[in-house]
Curated annotation (Swiss-Prot):
Keyword Electron transport in annotation: yes
Residues binding heme, per UniProt: 37, 57, 60-61
Annotated GO MF terms: electron transfer activity; heme binding; iron ion binding
Designated name of the protein: Cytochrome f
Co-factor(s): heme
Localisation per UniProt entry: Plastid, Chloroplast thylakoid membrane
Keyword Transcription regulation: no
Length: 320
């Protein structure tokens, strides 16, 4: 009896531990899955920008769309400033989701800063900047590249303009930083991609015919989607499955050719990249420019006064 009780106790303990692990897995892992898209690039590429200047997000998001960037022309050392990435798209647009249903578009962005520039810590943010970046999870591309920032996917309804709080370097403390003009590169996408990192196509694509022939039947599936039955010139029938949510461009009785599009393009999103320049300005240079400006103004005033004095002297001599 004691042995049976001990066995039952062990079984209950194993069951409890297993259940606890499952719950922890759901709590810890599931939220990260929604942020998996930038991780695709982080895991596959050491740098998000290729030698050609192309940002790697374009490998999965094939359609080209605009993206805008706003940043100050110049900043002082050890200063927090904001860079705004704008990802415009039609507010009425709906994308096809993985299960074939329609939903709102998600957005994501990557900002490639000069070395030394990085995400500003929370304790350096102003109240206004904290409000602008609330509920935004911006992270470095990698532990070694804190000058490259990524975010997404996040809902595009309220995030078509994403504010990145940036901290500029101080050349007095960072010997790698210099007072210079630097480029800033940015990439932004809206909607799902067409290619997974594995190379497989998503359902956000045009489906091409796998064979030529006549469509003799289009079968509607219970869970959505279609099976197209095609008979070729040799009277051999083949079938092709179309994922749920796609809109067919063909009908029964149509004759199709190899690689012909069978559905309308479901993609309403796309990726774009842009760039701007920023100057890390020396405070001493600004002070020098201010001194030079006031010196120039004083010199002009002095010149005008001397000219008027000279004219008075000339006028007095002419009166004699």
């Amino acid at each position: 009896m004691k042995l049976n009780s001990l066995i039952n106790l062990i079984q209950k303990s194993i069951y409890s531990c297993t259940l606890l692990l499952i719950i922890l897995n759901i709590i810890c892992v599931a939220p990260n899955s929604s942020n998996a898209f930038p991780i695709y690039a982080q895991q596959a590429y050491e740098s998000p920008r290729e030698a050609t200047g192309r940002i790697v997000c374009a490998n999965c998001h094939l359609a080209q769309k605009p993206v805008e960037i706003e940043a100050p022309q110049a900043v002082l050392p050890n200063t927090v400033f904001e860079t705004v990435v704008k990802i415009p798209y039609d507010s009425n647009a709906k994308q096809i989701l993985g299960n074939g249903s329609k939903g709102g578009l998600n957005v994501g962005a990557v900002v490639i800063l000069p070395e030394g520039f990085k995400l500003a810590p929370v304790n350096r943010l102003s109240t206004e900047l904290k409000e602008k970046t609330r509920n935004l999870y911006i992270q470095p591309y990698s532990a070694k590249q804190d000058n490259i920032l990524v975010i997404g996917p996040i809902s595009g309804d309220k995030n078509r303009e994403i504010v990145f709080p940036i901290l500029s370097p101080d050349p007095a403390k960072d010997k790698k930083a210099h007072f210079f003009k630097y480029p800033i590169y940015v990439g932004g996408n809206r909607g799902r991609g067409q290619i997974y990192p594995t190379g497989d196509k998503s359902n956000n694509n045009i489906v091409s015919a796998l064979s030529s022939g006549k469509i003799n039947k289009i079968e509607l599936l219970d869970k959505g989607g279609f099976i197209i039955h095609v008979t070729n010139s040799s009277n051999v029938e083949s079938t092709q499955k179309i994922s749920p949510g796609l809109e067919l461009r063909v009908k029964e009785g149509d004759t199709i050719q190899l690689d012909q599009a069978l559905n309308s393009d479901p993609n309403v999103g796309g990726f774009g990249q842009n760039e701007t320049e920023i100057v890390l300005q020396s405070p001493n240079r600004i002070k020098g420019m201010i001194v030079f400006f006031f010196a120039s103004v004083l010199a002009q005033i002095f010149f005008v006064l001397k000219k008027k004095q000279f004219e008075k002297v000339q006028a007095a001599e002419m009166n004699f």
